[in-house]
């Protein structure tokens, strides 16, 4: 009688052996937010009083609707602030690695600052920075 070799290879049995930890991590990461939301829904204080459902702002009850129009000047200041805030975000890593970057990065940073100075002069001439 001839022995028939088994078709089962040991390498194919452990094909997913590297993914068990990842799968467990994925399951835990999916369950934690669901359990946290369920626990907060079950453990929260139950209050049926209507006074607790009203909004509270600076010690006074709000009067009127919430849809009011803001002045356009607020948006202009916010826009100029965002522009120069983004400038700071881009210039900070450059300043940290200034010695390693060399002359080309210094010239590029000067061009970037020049463009932002032109934007500041433009906003100044358009009177976007004046509150009148």
Curated annotation (Swiss-Prot):
NDH-1 can be composed of about 15 different subunits; different subcomplexes with different compositions have been identified which probably have different functions. GO terms for biological process: photosynthesis, light reaction. It is found in: Cellular thylakoid membrane. It is a multi-pass membrane protein. The gene is ndhC. Its EC number is 7.1.1.-. InterPro entries: NAD(P)H_OxRDtase_bac/plastid, NADH_UbQ/plastoQ_OxRdtase_su3, NDAH_ubi_oxred_su3_sf. The chain crosses the membrane at residues 22-42, 76-96, 101-121. The keyword Thylakoid applies. One of its GO terms (cellular component) is plasma membrane-derived thylakoid membrane. Its main location: membrane. Disulfide bonds: none annotated. It catalyses: a plastoquinone + NADH + (n+1) H(+)(in) = a plastoquinol + NAD(+) + n H(+)(out); a plastoquinone + NADPH + (n+1) H(+)(in) = a plastoquinol + NADP(+) + n H(+)(out). One of its GO terms (molecular function) is NADH dehydrogenase (ubiquinone) activity. It holds the Pfam family Oxidored_q4. Gene3D superfamilies: NADH:ubiquinone/plastoquinone oxidoreductase, chain 3. This is NAD(P)H-quinone oxidoreductase subunit 3. Belongs to the complex I subunit 3 family. NDH-1 shuttles electrons from an unknown electron donor, via FMN and iron-sulfur (Fe-S) centers, to quinones in the respiratory and/or the photosynthetic chain. The immediate electron acceptor for the enzyme in this species is believed to be plastoquinone. Couples the redox reaction to proton translocation, and thus conserves the redox energy in a proton gradient. Cyanobacterial NDH-1 also plays a role in inorganic carbon-concentration. It is an enzyme of class 7 (translocase). It comes from the Bacteria. Keywords: Membrane, NAD, NADP, Plastoquinone, Quinone, Thylakoid, Translocase, Transmembrane, Transmembrane helix, Transport.
